[in-house]
Amino acid sequence: MAKQIEGVYENVLRCARQEFLEKGFALASLRDIAKAAGTSTGSIYTRFTDKAGLFRALVEPAAGELKRRFLEIQESFHQFDGQTQQEEMGRYTAHAQEGLFDYIYEHLPEFELLLRRAAGTEYAHYIDELVEIEVSYTYKYMEAVGYPARMEGALTEQLLHIVTTSRFESIFEVIRHGMSRA
């Protein structure tokens, strides 16, 4: 097996990030990335398998970690009894959301790719995955606190999905528009 040249991997990632940010996944060219990185497309295929693998290498660490943290927050909250959940919901949510925002802004280039340039990748529906997690745990919360709208059928699955999606879209819209954390 041929020895890989030191620094090429990092350089390819740097050039790929720029290419994907400028053109999006669908229009990005491995040839252009290889040229900018001073390597060959074969070198990229050896390291990343394909364009999707290269995109994944850029976004998965941050995307996976945010999802892991989000699930951990949900799980830890749902360890509380129903009364504690009801009493602590606002405070707990605000604190957790602040931590997630901090993480997103610490990994802003990755989330810009994920939110603005992922069409055509396995990450194109990343927000939908977060929405499904939130909807699932919202139902658990409603059961734990005996939320009457859920019990009486006034809150449909479709309405909850719409409201949750709009909340997530509004949160991530600030990233799409390049707004600073301050």
Regions found by a protein language model. Name each.
Residues 1-5:
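N-terminal intrinsically disordered/low-complexity leader segments
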Residues 11, 15, 19-53, 57:
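Helix-turn-helix
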Residues 56-65:
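Alpha-helical DNA-contacting segments of helix-turn-helix folds
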Residues 57, 71-103:
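Hydrophobic alpha-helical connector segments
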Residues 95, 99-106, 121-147, 158-165:
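Amphipathic alpha-helical packing segments from all-alpha helical-bundle domains
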Residues 113, 141-182:
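Hydrophobic/aromatic-rich alpha-helical bundle segments in the mid-to-C-terminal region
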